[in-house]
Amino acid sequence: MRALVSRTPIAAALRSATLGSQCASIQYNSLNILDRLPQPLPSRSFRIRYTGVSTSGRVTQTCRRSFQLSASSRDKRGPQSAEPDPLERLEVKKVQQQHENEKDDSGRDTKSGGKVAKAMTKGDTIAGKLLTTPSRLFKLLIPLTTINRKDIEQIAILIHPQQPLSHLERLIQSEVPPIEDENGQKRPPAVSFIALQLEQDAIRPKRGMYEGTDAEIHRVEGGKDDATVAKRGEDFQEVDETFSYLRRPGPGQGDKEQRFIRWSQSTEIGDFIRDAARAKEFIVTIEGAPAGLEQIHVAVPSFDERTYFLRMRLRKISRRIQGLAEIKHECDALAHRGAQRVALGGFGILAFWWYIVYKLTFETDLGWDTMEPVTYLVSLSTLMGGYLWFLYHNREISYRSALDFTINARQKKLYQMKGIDLQVWESLIDEANAIRREIKNIAAEYDVDWDERKDEQDDRVTEALKKERRLKNGSQKEERPKDDRDDD
């Protein structure tokens, strides 16, 4: 083995290998360059390492001759004529440029395009995802390019359902690098939102109208600037191809096609997602994005994913309601039994009064003449006392009202004894009904049947929520006729 130390470029160093050498170890500017050239060269492969870059190739018969000629000419010229020629300088410059292109601005090796190139060569599908948060906002995870356009980053964007799509467009524009227009001025790229159109009358691009417009312009301009007209036709052809790409046959509909349509930027995000939920995805198109990122497919969450936090909150509230419902059920049962005992006690008092009047009227010397005014006055006094009682408590004069009053009074005492706060109970019931109503609305959007008993977890919780809804619906029905009478 012969070691050569030279400051000449790679080609000159290779020419220094003579025909008789079996292998050569070449060191160039403190960089190890290994080249094994066994003679009589039975192998055709060689590998050169320069600044960490591996270059492989095939050695042909012509290369062998060039090595031989270079070696012989070097022996004839001598050491003083070993000056780098233009071809050698071009070779070194090309390798340096290749090495510089493989590093980004921060000096990190990006391996020829970074993750964008890797994803495109592997054929991976770059897609985003829409998630929900406990605060009932949407979290959009979308892959976007960095400023140097050599890498892809997952960007998380929090959006409110009542915000317009234009707000989401501005958020995406702030994360992507600007593009240059025809005048060389930088501007934010245009962002469009496309969703599947499930109606039968799909909106189709009228390509014939564009072609007719081009022909008319060409005729008016007198046939000049054919390149501009041809370019405009290519643009419309690209638009038509884009819409052809955003087209797929409907499931179970034979040859019928489903098309995607672009939504206005003034549409609320909640309405857009509600419509895109039927197709389970929508597309975000970014102007000037690298290959593979012009159309980002964003997966819309399913019903279970969309209502996950709502159902978890409902289950948590249901467990609290269940613990209170057990104690409340015992207190209510005791209160009802107490009210029944009060009613039976009132009947016993009336029966005892009837027996006294009978005894005093027919079995004593008082007789009917004395007992008649007594019974009349006692009955009238009882009626007047009851009337005053209903006026004082502002209640309707009925047995049901008196029974409810008795039950409620007994319930309050029992609740205080058991440590139940009615305000907490009512707030939990109202919140559970509100969450249930929201989940029902989302289920209607997704066209699914939601079994509320699985999340409410107990029949007593279901009955408590249903009872509260009935009370509210009954009060609303009673208030509506009153409002109508007031309007009249």
Curated annotation (Swiss-Prot):
Keyword hit for Transit peptide: yes
Transmembrane residue ranges: 340-361, 371-391
Transmembrane recorded as keyword: yes
Mitochondrial matrix compartment spans: 75-339, 392-488
Coiled-coil regions listed in the entry: none
Gene Ontology molecular function: calcium channel activity; metal ion binding; uniporter activity
Membrane topology: Multi-pass membrane protein
Effect of E372 to Q/D: Abolished calcium channel activity
A GO CC annotation given for this chain: mitochondrial inner membrane
Segments of this protein annotated with the region Disordered: 65-117, 464-488
Documented effect of changing D369E: Increased calcium channel activity. Abolished inhibition by ruthenium red derivative Ru360
Domain of life of the organism encoding this protein: Eukaryota
UniProt binding sites for Ca(2+): E372
Impact after mutating P373A: Abolished calcium channel activity
Locus of motif Selectivity filter: 368-376
Free-text activity regulation comment from the record: Inhibited by ruthenium red or its derivative Ru360.
Topological domains annotated Mitochondrial intermembrane: 362-370
Reaction catalysis annotation: Ca(2+)(in) = Ca(2+)(out)
Function comment: Highly selective calcium channel localized to the inner mitochondrial membrane, which mediates calcium uptake into the mitochondrial matrix. Mitochondrial calcium homeostasis plays key roles in cellular physiology and regulates ATP production, cytoplasmic calcium signals and activation of cell death pathways. Sufficient to operate as a pore-forming channel without the need of calcium-sensor or auxiliary subunit.
Subunit text: Homotetramer, assembles in a dimer or dimers configuration with two interfaces.
The family this protein is said to belong to: Belongs to the MCU (TC 1.A.77) family.
Domain-related comment: The selectivity filter, in which calcium ions are arranged in single file, is composed of two acidic rings separated by one helical turn along the central axis of the channel pore.
Name of the featured protein: Calcium uniporter protein, mitochondrial
Taxonomic source organism: Neosartorya fischeri (strain ATCC 1020 / DSM 3700 / CBS 544.65 / FGSC A1164 / JCM 1740 / NRRL 181 / WB 181)
